[in-house]
Amino acid sequence: MDPVLHVPAFQDNYIWLIRGRRAPHKVAIVDPGEAAPVLAALRTHKLTPVAILCTHHHDDHVGGVEELLEHFPLPVYGPAREHIDGVSHPLSEDARAVVPELDLDFGVLDIPAHTAGHIAYHGNGMLFCGDTLFSAGCGRLFEGSAAQMAQSLAKLAALPDDTAVYCGHEYPAANLRFALAVEPDNRAAQAHLTQVQAWRAAGRPCRAAAASSFTSDS
């Protein structure tokens, strides 16, 4: 059983549902940009939410929080340096996001650049990095600098090599086409694009890979 379910939202967002180790019918919801697809997934898979984890304040990642709270009285974890309605547990670097119902314990990293207070959750072999790191790319600099992005990516690159990376958007094909426009003879990019296209044709999200692979590709 996959420990993480993906819920497509909007045009290219991913909302993640993390299953409990000992209670796979319970889940934590990561970056619910809208509530409707989450509620549908919960019904379809007969899942019970126990927490919400937010990486940053952009509406396409938190727009569904308030509606979900109308259905479920959940703890909401989020960045301490950003205002997100509904957050009950503000977090910054070296804090822990502990979800006892799922037997999960996540560390928190401050990874500013895309937004000023962006955080990531890591642990249990997983990384939820919001809009900082993508397959073959990184997030746009809306509130930070290139130097901050480099520092944030360096933090992510230092995580264990076998960390599964869960990003906030389905961007790899566009990122790789851009890379090939700049370096048309880049065989690694060509091979990666072919793989990504095969994944998408099979309905698979391009979301989880080794942290070392993601950061080196990006």
Annotate each PLM feature.
Residues M1-L47, A120-G130:
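Conserved beta-strand hairpin/beta-sheet module of binuclear metal-dependent hydrolase folds
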Residues L17, R96-H122, A158:
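Core dinuclear metal-dependent hydrolase active-site scaffold
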Residues I18, D31, H56, L68, ...:
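Divalent metal-coordination and catalytic microenvironments
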Residues K26-V27, E34-G107:
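Active-site HxH/HxHxD metal-binding segment of metal-dependent hydrolases
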Residues P32-E34, H57, R81-E82, H114-T115, ...:
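Active-site metal-binding loops of divalent metal-dependent hydrolases
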Residues I52-V62, L109-A116, Y166-P172:
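Histidine-centered catalytic micro-motifs
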Residues C138, F142-T163:
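Active-site-adjacent loop/tail segments of enzyme domains
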Residues A154-A164, A173-S218:
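Accessory terminal helices/loops
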